[in-house]
Amino acid sequence: MNAISNRREFLRTAALAGAGLTLSSPLLGTKPKTVLVFTKSSGWEHDVVKRIGGKPCIVDDAVNDLGNKLGFNVGVTKDGRIFESKEFHSYVGVVFFTTGDLTTLGTDGKPPMTVKGKQTLLDAVRGGMGFAGVHAASDTFHTQPDPPDRSNRYIAHGENEDPYLRMVGAEFITHGRDEDPRLQTANVIVNDPKFPGLGGVTSPVSFMEEWYSLKDFAPDMHVILTLDTHTMNGACYQRAPYPVTWARTHGKGRVFYTAMGDRPENWKNEFFLNLLGGGIRWTIGDASAQLEENLKQAAPGYAEIPPKQAPEK
């Protein structure tokens, strides 16, 4: 399918997604792989996933453009019912930019997943479906209980962590505050310059972002990028460098996660888009990578948890 017809189909599926589920794109002659972009916000709704005036959100548009460039089709939805539909099994991979407990209606008011739907997702990934998590995908399905003071997020849960987060590879604790400031330019260390999308990138890379502070890292992960915290401001960064992008296998499935992607302008950044495109391609089997477990080597102090902060009002 050429880019023009693929774009037309994408706009059609995006329009359908406002009311319900999406349709995967047909192909002319062949049948390229199709990924589902899921952007339900049961917690905080980021600007990049807001649909304004019935138009696709920034994330939907950007992933579709990557698909046009890299050769995969895209379906989009905020409707959690899709995970119990026949359509869900037509996708070879999913891209998550989500927040909160997705089994609740939450902030955006879109239909939630069910507990069964969540398990269907987990089983699908373990069975071979690709999963690419972006930014707030680690701020989703927090290990319970998750009280208002967020105290449980400062505890290492290990094998008791929510199974969704165990699949993703880590859990969001918090991020910098406005006075830190919230958005900071920091260096990321490229631990694997051969990972798809990173060809020719030299380390470190300077990048402005709302940097997530993370914990409960999967011990079997292959770290791709590490955040250099030494020059950063804010209590949540008073810790040793830690992973902010990685890949791992989960059963037969491939999981990629990057903590980047908060700011709208970053969805036009070449480094970020190349990284995300490479990650998606790897999760659906269109790109290869050698994944050695390197957590302890890439980030020896990964297990440090920063001092607890009271939630922002």
Predicted regions and their residues:
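A glycine-rich, often tryptophan-bearing local segment used as a flexible ligand/cofactor-contacting loop or short
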Residues: 101-196
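C-terminal segment of N-terminal export signals and the immediately downstream linker at the start
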Residues: 3, 25-44
